[in-house]
């Protein structure tokens, strides 16, 4: 894994392939290693860049910053690698920063692919999310036992409507790494309590946007998807059968198909009809 210093932060990244640039932005609590189920297949078509955001995994020693720091980091990394404009794929919290990147630095983004972006998630909590918080004593554990609080969040976010969750099935190394940076996860979650980016910022985005939605995901993520697409008339939602919030891990082959279709490298699938008022 290579390194690049941007905005005073030493970021670790991995690069594969030689096609059009594709930047992968991981979610809150995740890290670049979780893209491994799709990296090789994506590299057949794209120049893929996957990095650990500041505060996570191998970039954990980077100075902490606010939420906007992640968009600035991504823009600077693309510039340093000569990879702009790129298709930017943001998963969960990474989708929030992908939106921010497209709003703040539109010239760096050719298109957005958002895998259940967790934008304004706290403005539409669901019974599942509230039950997770109550059952785990989430708010009490945040300070007393960060790893336990992060575990509860990971299990809820990766949960299937049919029962069980994807987090518990991940390789042990991945789970251990995600729990190791629990404090960074909880700090970022706390920062995301306020709606971010603003509605005006999201509305300013003009590039093509595809939102990927798992048909087994918690309704909170479905609501977030609808919120984002309600602000972006050019956006469309594509459903991924058999997947919950860890979409590219649950259904890696189909996930790659959706990404390649979204960027014009394959026939486009049928979009899910809009569920929000016009």
Residue ranges of each PLM-predicted region?
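Active-site loop/oxyanion-hole signature of alpha/beta-hydrolase fold enzymes
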Residues: 37-40, 49-89, 93, 257
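Catalytic histidine-centered segment of alpha/beta-hydrolase-like enzymes
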Residues: 240-252, 256
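Conserved catalytic-core motifs of eukaryotic protein kinase domains, centered on the activation segment
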Residues: 34-36, 59-64, 124-125, 222-223
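Flexible "cap/lid" loop of the alpha/beta hydrolase fold
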Residues: 103-104, 109-142
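Hydrolases whose catalytic domains are alpha/beta-hydrolase-1, hotdog thioesterase
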Residues: 97-101
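Conserved HGGG/HGGXW glycine-rich cap/lid loop of the alpha/beta-hydrolase fold
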Residues: 6-61
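Conserved serine/cysteine hydrolase catalytic core
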Residues: 176-230, 236-239
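Conserved alpha/beta-hydrolase catalytic His-Asp/Glu region
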Residues: 144-186, 201
């Amino acid at each position: 894994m290579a390194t690049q210093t941007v905005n005073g932060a030493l970021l670790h990244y991995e690069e594969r392939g030689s096609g059009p640039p594709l930047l992968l932005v991981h979610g809150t609590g995740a890290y670049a290693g979780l893209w491994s189920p799709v990296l090789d297949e994506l590299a057949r078509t794209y120049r893929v860049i996957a990095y650990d955001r500041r505060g996570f995994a191998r970039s954990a020693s980077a100075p902490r910053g606010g939420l906007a720091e992640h968009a600035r980091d991504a823009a600077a990394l693309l510039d340093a690698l000569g990879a702009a404009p790129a298709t930017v794929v943001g998963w969960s919290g990474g989708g929030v920063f992908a939106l921010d990147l497209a709003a703040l630095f539109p010239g760096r983004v050719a298109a957005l692919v958002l895998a259940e972006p967790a934008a304004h998630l706290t403005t539409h909590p669901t019974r599942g999310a509230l039950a997770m918080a109550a059952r785990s004593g989430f708010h009490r554990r945040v300070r007393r036992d960060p790893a336990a609080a992060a575990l509860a969040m990971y299990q809820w976010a990766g949960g299937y409507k049919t029962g069980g969750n994807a987090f518990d099935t991940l390789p042990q190394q991945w789970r251990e790494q995600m729990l190791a940076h629990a404090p960074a996860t909880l700090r970022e979650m706390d920062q995301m309590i306020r709606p971010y980016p603003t509605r005006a910022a999201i509305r300013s985005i003009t590039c093509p946007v595809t939102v990927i939605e798992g048909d087994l995901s918690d309704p909170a993520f479905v609501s977030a998807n609808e919120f984002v697409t309600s602000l972006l008339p050019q956006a469309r939602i594509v459903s991924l059968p058999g997947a919950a919030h860890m979409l590219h891990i649950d259904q890696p082959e189909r996930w790659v198909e959706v990404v390649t279709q979204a960027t014009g490298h394959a026939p486009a699938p049928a979009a899910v009809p809009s569920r929000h008022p016009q």
